[in-house]
Each structure stands twice: as structure tokens, then as C-alpha cells.
Amino acid sequence: MITEDVGTFSDTVEEAASVEACTKCTACNTVCPVARSTEIFRGPKFLGPESERYRSQPEATVTAGLDLCSGCKLCEVTCPSQVTIQEYIRRAQNKGAEEKGRTLRDWVLGHTRVLSQFGSMTAPLANIGNRNPVVRWVMERVLGIHHKRPLPAYQWMTFERWFKRHRAQAPTPTVSNASMALKRRSRGPTGPPREPGREKRTVAYFSACWVNFNERRLGEMVVHVLERNGIAVTVPKQQCCGIPAVVNSNMDLARKYGKENLRSLSALPPDVDIVASSTSCGLMLKHDYDHLLDIPGAAAIGARVYDICEYLWMLHEAGELKQDFEPVQTRVLYHAPCHLKSHGIGYPAMRLLRLIPGVVVEEVDEGCCGISGTYGVKVEKYDLSMKIGSRLFEAVKAAGSDSVLADCETCRMQVEHGSGARSAHPLEILARAYGYR
Amino acid sequence: MKADIAVVGSGLAALVATRTLQQAGRNAVLIWPGLSSLYFTYATVDVLGYADDTTVQPVEQPEAGVAQLIADHPEHPYAIAGLDALRGGTALLTEWLGEAGFKWQGSLARNLLLPTAIGTPKPCCLVPDSMAAGDLRRDEPIVFCGFSGYEDFVPELAASNLARAWGRGDQTVRALRLALPGFEPGRLFTSIDLARSFENEAFRRDVATGLRAVLDDGTVRIGMPAVLGLTHDSDVHAQFENEIGHPVFEIPTLPPSVLGLRLFDRLRKHIQESGVEIIWAAPAHAAEVSDGRCRRIHLKSAGRELPIDARAYVLALEDTVDGAMRAGVHDVIDPFFHQTLAHHAVPTERTNESLFKPQPFASIGYPVTDRLQPGGEDGRPLAENVFVAGGAIAGYDPVGTKSRGGLAVATGYRAAKEAMAA
């Protein structure tokens, strides 16, 4: 039983400190992907609520083992008493780093946006460097980034620049060959062209660093799908969401980023919905700015943030999603990212894809992929991260599928690296059904 | 989000209800506040172990026992759900276990009598194959095998307790302890760690060799804590038995229960892979009712509320562990309609000081109508299209009568049937 505020002082104790709601049931330890894969990790129960009872602000934090937590949040998803296990671990980790000082790698991995900006500016060169064994050897020695971990390729043309050009283009819709073909087969119209100023809804797209510097194509697809449904898209000024800083023990930096984003998003008209295509960045905006980072005003913005598939499904239920899909004959696997489970919205991507004729989508339910953002990049965690994901890789190989869908970009990197299959965002299939090529 | 029928809960009642809906071709969505009560409370599915919580003589025929209970207590949740629901639900569950890859045995006709971790005989109805060799109606001598450093199962305690209740003729009991490779003194571990290790063939062979060395050649069966594999239980158990050369039976231990985890994980995976969507990590906290029908329930998802609009709802929460109720100092309140389910001048009224006496809090729950709808003070349904299943139903204590599983199955099945008709 969980105490809720029913009016007396003692009833609010557990809500104020959810550590008191922990019943020591150990469910979190049983689902923890790290504890499953290494016996040196004590598990979320011990490092979260149990250790929390012994932590106090003036005392030095005992950080042994805290850095092994990958931040997947499955412990919180699992907890029957809604204890914020992961937040206790993160705060303690951060305090430990403040006391002991941060490493160079903490700084570098916490500033992925700065790295990406640099990588994008020097794009072809940076990508060659990232694949060069000598450079990788140096990176491993100096930064502690494992030489086997493929690093994402940067693109010179950022999404934001593409979007500016896209906006500047004449508002005439681009009718692709595929939809022309569709018309010839007289399957009905492919939907109205883009009519600026006449859209019923406006969406602010939080494209995040990944789409901006590494996978512009995904951003183009998001814009295509939204505009195809008569929605006006804007791309507000944005900063890194802050999650790389959170998981690399720099919550002050994450808070600074969060405040910048909130300043920009607060300037949007109140009827503009905010949409994100990165699972973890969306979760930061929705939940962690308010709960973990305690940024004032975050709750009001968080309530306006949607995952892209969640948003599209909402349109579908409101009867606003165009159903003139071109059939896509494909059989794909779907991997649900851990952070998607934390959203508490189910699996809207699977629901959406099942609307499209020809698509057969099956869930591969083997838990965490193991990469957890920058976790699996680190030299001492690479092997562990591959071990965590091994069940998923085996299942993908056993299913004989060469295509795995996942909403989260680092899950996609890990699935490709571990299983050899190609991995894409679920939107890719939807965009294809809407004639995007 | 729209749904045909929404099932809230993650225990056995919720899973049986969802499976019933799925088999009828209905589109169910399963909503979880957190992990399942299966983790904590289930190893076997017990239909009726004792006629009431004061009797000492176990029930031999659970179906006949439930029929008698229904005749004696027309207000009991078994009576409301009906004997047909128990039969139908049990048949559905048994078939499902087979499809999901489990090897289980037992029937409503007869209970097995299995030793617990403290050596007391416990009547059980449906049990995993890996437990069945422990049946105390069989006469072979028992050796309880524990492990050094593992305190959730004390073989000496189990042996001395069982010897008192069971010990005629061939029925001898003894205890031994093995040291396990890799589990040196000082290492902190749980049954989950042991179960993972037993999936490793080399580890298992080492343990088997160690165990064979201390056993005589005579007929004997080995009782071990339930740690024979976390996911591949039946294989691990069969292989271990082969390596030992004696029948081996598993005994459920304290949470985290490996048996509960196996059951829950595989049923969940099976139902999810067959197309049922699960919404994780979204506790439900309010219901909107108008004109006598529930129009939507509200879930706490990240950042905002997620309303679920369904035609009907099954509230299959399993009391305390699933967050079915909110207990304050004086009142216990339900999370949907915010009704006061129980009022106490002081919280200690909810508990009995003796741990082994019936606990008043166990029978707190929703009063229900004859169709399992949650009832208001006037006895009329709070909402026509909402049905309650499992431990959240008021008026029974599943612990003392060993009936939690059967009630979850019967009420989950019946609630699903009612939801389809609503």
C-alpha cells in the first residue's frame, strides 16, 4: 500500500521521500540488466533506496559501484511502489563526482552537442578519423572510449539548415513518383497539399542533437509525415536535452541546458504541441527536467511534450491521421527501448505500423540492448554492454530478420553493431507509406 | 488512448482476464502500475487448501471443497464468481501454460501436499513439474539440500519440522548443505543469482558431482530451494535430475521467488508476443463516471496524464503489492473511485499482532455486486462497465485458506466474461 496525501502529516511522509515506500521486494534487482550480467553490481535496490538511508548532504558519498548503473530506468518501471530508484542513484553519483572531481571523459561525453557541432563542421574528416584505428587507439588511451564501439557518422548538412531551406522553398507540395503511381491505380487522393497558414495544428519539433548532426533523414521524415497530415511544423531554437550530462555526473550542466531549452519552448504559443523523435530526449523534457533536475516551470512544458509516435497515434484516435497509406510489404521486428517504457504510453509505434497495409511487425521482447547512451561507449563497460544486449542480438539473429525498428537512436546503433541487422526508427516505414523516398 | 477493454493489474487475475479476452477475439490492453504480485505471492496455483482459516485438516478435493464453500457462504467471492468460472478459468490457464512452454501438473480433482521451505505440508492444486516429486503422499525418504551462505532455505529447519508431521516407516527426512562454486562466504546473493548460475551447464555439473558424493545409493528424493534455472526451468530441472540420478523437487523460497518470476515472465512475454499491448509504468489513479458508466480512467504517464477510454474495465489489482489501495492513517481508499474501503481509529486495527493469525488488512477491498462490479454504499454498482478481480475484492483472506490462485483465476475469468458483455 502506498500512502497518498489524505490530509495528515504522517500520510505525506512516503510521498515526500519515496525511499520510505520501498518494501525491499527486490523486483528491481531481478529486472536490472546490469545486475543480470555482472555479479560485481549490487543492483538498484542496494544502490538506490537502501543506500539512500545512509546518505546525507554533509557526508562524503560512497560511490563504489554507482557508475555501473546504466540509467535504463527499468528499476523504476518495475517498482510496484513507484520508488524513484534511479534518481537516488543519479544524485549520489553526481554528488560523488562533485566531491572527487570529474574526469576528462565525463566532460567530453557530457558535452556531446559540442562534439557533434565540431564533428558536423569537419564532417567527412571527423568520420574518417572516427574509423581510423590509430585515432581510435588514442581515443581509448586518452578518453577511455572503447576502440570497438562504432561512433555515429556526422553529416555536414545539419537538420536545422535543411529545415531553413525547406521553409524557404515555395509552398507547392512535392508529389513523389510513388504517390503519382498510387493515383494512377486510382486508390484515391494522396491528401491535400501543404497550405501554409491553413493548418489546424502547429507542432514544435524538438529534433535533438542526433537528428541535427547525425540522422537528418529522420528529421526530414518527421516533417514530411506531419506536413502530410496538414500540420505546420516549426523547429524551435534548442540545446542538448542534457541527458548525456546527467549520466556523466554533471547535473549542473544538464540543468543549464534544460533551462535554455525551457526558455525557448516557453516562448511558443500555448496551443503549440512539442514533439520529440528521440525517446530519451523526450523523457528528459517530459519528466526529468521537473523531477530529477527540479527546474522551475518544467512541469508545464513537460505536459506539452509528446513522443512522435504517441502524437501521431493521438491524431489517429482524433480522426486526424490520413489513412491513404501506400502498402509497404515488409516483415520487421520491433525493439521497445527501456526509456520508452518509462514514458508510460505503451508502444504507439507498433499500433501505428499495424495501420499500414502489408506491414507485419513483431516485437522482439528481450529487454535492454545494453548501450544506454554513452554507457556502452566506455572502455571498461563495452564488454558488459555487449553482454547485456546478447539476448537481444541472439533473438534478432534467430528471427532471421534483417531489419529491426527501435525508437531510440543508441538502441539502433547497438542492435546494428551486435546483431548485424539494419535498424531504423519506426517512422521510416510510416514515411514510406506516405510516399516519402 | 482508446481501447476495447482495459485490464488494470499485473498479477494472475489480470493475466487470466487478458487471456480470456484475447481468446474471445477481443482487443485488450494491459495496464501495469509496476511489477506483478506473481513475483511475491505465487509459486503454485492454490485453489483451496483449507476449508477456513482455522482448520488444520487440508482439503483433498479442491473443486468439491469450493462447491461446499459456495453452499455455506453465498457472499464469498468464489460464490459470486461461480464454480463454472473456476472450471473455465482453470482450463484456460492450464492450456495456456502448455502453450507458453511450461510443464505443469495437477487438477481441480485433487490437491498435492508439498513441503514448504520451513518443512510444513502445504496443499497445492496446480504445480510446476519441478515441484511434484515433493508430494508427501509418496513414501520415499527426503533429503533437503541447502547451500552454504544461502539463508532463505535452512535444510535443518525444514527437516526437523517435517519429521514431526511426516515420519512413518520409510518416511525419513534428513538435511545436508553444499558449498557452491563461486558463492564464497561474504558474497551477497539471492535465489535469482543462484538460478542464473544453475543455467550454466558446468556449474550445474559441479553441484551434481558434489551432491552425488554425499548421497547413498538407496532410494531417496532431493528437496532443493527453487533455483533450478530462471528462464529454462524444465530443462534445467530434468538435466539436474539426470545428473543426480534421484528425483529432485523444488521448494518455493522467500521473495524474490524464482518460481513466481518464471511464471510471470513467460506468461507476460507470451501474451505480449501474441499481440496484447502492455502499458508499463503507468499507475492508474482516477476513474471518470457519468450516467452510471465509467468513461475513462486516468494513468500517470511521464509528464502528464494518459486517459484510457475503454468500453469496459477489469480492475484486477492484487491488493497491497499492486497499489490497489491507498492506505492513510485512518482510511484505506481505492485509487479509482476514491471510496473509503475501510476506516480505522488507529492503523494497528488493520493488523493482528500474531503473524500467523488472519490479518484484517488482507480482506480489505472493493465490495462487489453479483456481477463483480464495484459496489457503493447502497450496494449498487459504482459503474456498470467496471469489474473487479483478484485480491482487490473485499471479504476474504486468501492466505489462511490457501486460495489466492483459484480466486484470481475464477474472478479474472468471470470479470473478463462480464466485461465482454458490458
PLM features: residue spans?
Chain A
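Short, intrinsically disordered, charge-biased short linear motifs at domain edges
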Residues: 7-19, 55-66, 226-229, 354-358
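Short secondary-structure boundary segments
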Residues: 33-36, 42, 67, 73, ...
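Iron-sulfur cluster-binding electron-transfer modules in prokaryotic oxidoreductases
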Residues: 85-437
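Cysteine-centered iron-sulfur cluster-binding motifs in ferredoxin-type domains/subunits
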Residues: 16-35, 61-83, 116, 213, ...
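Non-heme iron-sulfur electron-transfer modules
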Residues: 1-7, 11, 34-64, 82-107, ...
